[in-house]
Amino acid sequence: MDSGAGGRRCPEAALLILGPPRMEHLRHSPGPGGQRLLLPSMLLALLLLLAPSPGHATRVVYKVPEEQPPNTLIGSLAADYGFPDVGHLYKLEVGAPYLRVDGKTGDIFTTETSIDREGLRECQNQLPGDPCILEFEVSITDLVQNGSPRLLEGQIEVQDINDNTPNFASPVITLAIPENTNIGSLFPIPLASDRDAGPNGVASYELQAGPEAQELFGLQVAEDQEEKQPQLIVMGNLDRERWDSYDLTIKVQDGGSPPRASSALLRVTVLDTNDNAPKFERPSYEAELSENSPIGHSVIQVKANDSDQGANAEIEYTFHQAPEVVRRLLRLDRNTGLITVQGPVDREDLSTLRFSVLAKDRGTNPKSARAQVVVTVKDMNDNAPTIEIRGIGLVTHQDGMANISEDVAEETAVALVQVSDRDEGENAAVTCVVAGDVPFQLRQASETGSDSKKKYFLQTTTPLDYEKVKDYTIEIVAVDSGNPPLSSTNSLKVQVVDVNDNAPVFTQSVTEVAFPENNKPGEVIAEITASDADSGSNAELVYSLEPEPAAKGLFTISPETGEIQVKTSLDREQRESYELKVVAADRGSPSLQGTATVLVNVLDCNDNDPKFMLSGYNFSVMENMPALSPVGMVTVIDGDKGENAQVQLSVEQDNGDFVIQNGTGTILSSLSFDREQQSTYTFQLKAVDGGVPPRSAYVGVTINVLDENDNAPYITAPSNTSHKLLTPQTRLGETVSQVAAEDFDSGVNAELIYSIAGGNPYGLFQIGSHSGAITLEKEIERRHHGLHRLVVKVSDRGKPPRYGTALVHLYVNETLANRTLLETLLGHSLDTPLDIDIAGDPEYERSKQRGNILFGVVAGVVAVALLIALAVLVRYCRQREAKSGYQAGKKETKDLYAPKPSGKASKGNKSKGKKSKSPKPVKPVEDEDEAGLQKSLKFNLMSDAPGDSPRIHLPLNYPPGSPDLGRHYRSNSPLPSIQLQPQSPSASKKHQVVQDLPPANTFVGTGDTTSTGSEQYSDYSYRTNPPKYPSKQVGQPFQLSTPQPLPHPYHGAIWTEVWE
């Protein structure tokens, strides 16, 4: 095909178009004596129908011989691609300086820079047989439809011509051959090299010898790994003494047409006998080497063996026919055969190192062997992606900047971005993105690109607006998939060109001006300004005024500054406000305008009270908040303006507990709330404006304090020092003790959970998590006898929860005959850490034995003392009865000693004055003979206050021989039953409960006449209550049946009430 530009078509050029649908189109120019190959018209029409649509990415491949003269036509894109000859703009994006493109026809020509296949950088490190490819890109813009440019990718396959002569590395080649060499032995001759490829490379070798060597030597060419290896074959017996060297000529010729040839002198030196040649362990070696390996890194070690001895077996290793690049990068140890790195290895420059290693012995006539070594260079992620940004279509770039009008359509291409990575595999898989929040995105320009080389269109995503953003700095980031990944960035500045698309905009669409009445004419009311986001004349503004009918003739405006003046005096009583319309027009073409409204309010006097937004405020806050914490916020408004609307807030009817911030209306507390002390606060807020005279308003505020879990549960029963007898006959599931506790918090913070935290090694007992009732879960065995100390934990459900701990002593035995032992066990329990179970403790058992001995001694002393005390008491009581004239069985109705709990005891053990949970006392019994009863029992009369009823206190220390007081009262006294209430636990140290009566005389129960206490019966039960004044305690209570404890928060000594 002839060029319309005067160029000539490359005779051997061939076209291959790649794209959907895929097809191949070949054209051949007529050669000497041949005719041009023409396609049938039907096939041509079919190709036009099947040509790839403009929206698809297309690749075109041309095959061109190297060294073509300038202006040689390679191909016509318009004809080959199916575009019309007019209406399109063709632009060469990639391919200079070897190619040029006609902008109208799309014809591709060669340039003054000749395409030399051997000189192209892309083809210098190719493996034999690989094609030499020169890539180019052409953008095609439809000037008629003014659409986005299309990118056409193409390749020039540069075909080799025979322009290089094959040559040997040296004009003289020397071979040393021992004299005892067997006939048929082969000796390799160094290869000749030819820079051409394929058929134009080395094709044949020819040996030329003189008469003396013609019968001794021959040439044999072996095909080895796509190369022809010339070998000298020994055809006769050699005699060094007869002839020690021969000069031969070896000729090499390529396969070009016409062929090229050269020759070299082959000098054969005959050596003395060394009959064994070295032999490599393997005929060939393969190794992998990571690029950028350090100097001295071991690559591979070749090893050969020689059956000779002495110097003939000493092997020396050398490179054989190794290219210069191998000798520069690798080092071969002559003695060990170890190959190490001696230069920087870069896979991107050379991916495979192929060479031979010669092993030669040190004999007089050295023998040698050759092994092939192939080193594959492994890729390392040592190359960051490269990003190239250039213009596309009608958008040109200069100094890294592109100009584009703000009214362009969406998805307009601004630039062509090419991203590539010199690595391979995952290290070359590049991901490219636009960084930052900019209205631009990357769209893939070609679907045929590899992972290591991709092209994108940088296009807009939304309409551009000069008034919002005048320029963009687009940063493009490319990251490969290596480990660790490498990245690079490049940026493009896009300058947005302004068009008059914005109307003037006022600072405020509505401006309200307060202007006093009785003003002077000509005074300035306000200055109204507008702005235009455009630039130049598009932003020059002119102001005008369009007042409402009522304001016509009263106001005027400056066209240049927008200053509004009043022309006459205003009178508020005639009109309170005026509405003015201000127009601002720019000087663009066509002109755009904007409007604003000015409301002129005539000022008035202070005639409005402040007003709270609500008629009353109710806030809820958590207790224990730190002082100066906000508890609520109020809002107050004033219908006036200026100082008349400046409101000051203050707290009324308050003790300094609260303050208020005038700026925010926030109410702050000056104390930390405690709900248990006070749950509600009420006060008033006062608002006063700044008018003259001032106006004020009031509002009520209520603060409700919400509960926080700041109180731990406290144990009301039993005492830590109390105990209970548990006989082996106790039934399973029977309640053996009851733990009671209280919590001064509320809600879930006061919901209690009971659990046994320790002291239950045998699993005999279980506690109700909600009831606190301890029940027997296993049958009592002999090994279970003794004192069991249960550590009961009582926790609430607060977050975080709080807890209290109680000790429950259960004495498993048949009887309580040995009280001294029990008291010793209890003392040991109180001195034992809670994490030790006293039940089954060997040390504890030994203390029991020691207690038994001590009990025996004490029991004897107590028995004697009891007998003496009983005799004295009986005699004394009889004398008292005779003197008082007491008559048994007579009932008195007078209330002698009505118990009243003291004020201090009722407060319990809470330091913050929380509510007491003590039980209410039962109505007391009246007795007529007050003096007789007091003298008979030796009670100490104590009174809480002048108005309190007298209270009877039992003596705290009884002699060991004290009589059975229950039997004495039953037979000789008309007193009602006496109840002793078990003492509740104390928050301090250890607590003891006074046992006032001997074990044999103790009655346990609620006053039932059938209840038993040891061997005796009594009509009277007892109950202990805390006294107002503390006393010393010396005893411990015990019970034979299930107790019914009455919880009480008081601590101290026991006081007894006489009730009926």
UniProtKB/Swiss-Prot annotation:
Matches recorded under Pfam families: Cadherin, Cadherin_2, Protocadherin
Gene Ontology cellular component list: cell junction; cell-cell junction; intracellular membrane-bounded organelle; nucleolus; nucleoplasm; plasma membrane
Domain Cadherin: start-end pairs: 58-168, 169-280, 281-387, 396-506, 507-612, 613-715, 718-844
Expression (tissue specificity): Highly expressed in the brain and neuro-glial cells.
Region Disordered: start-end pairs: 884-1045
Protein location: Cell junction; Cell membrane
Segments of skewed composition (Basic and acidic residues): 884-897
Keyword Transmembrane on entry: yes
Gene3D superfamilies xrefs: Cadherins
Residue ranges with Basic residues bias: 907-920
Gene Ontology biological process terms in this record: cell adhesion; cell-cell signaling; homophilic cell adhesion via plasma membrane adhesion molecules; nervous system development
A molecular function (GO) term: calcium ion binding
Signal peptide boundaries: 1-57
Function: May be involved in cell-cell interaction processes and in cell adhesion.
UniProt name for this protein: Protocadherin-1
Organism this protein belongs to: Homo sapiens
Gene name linked to the record: PCDH1
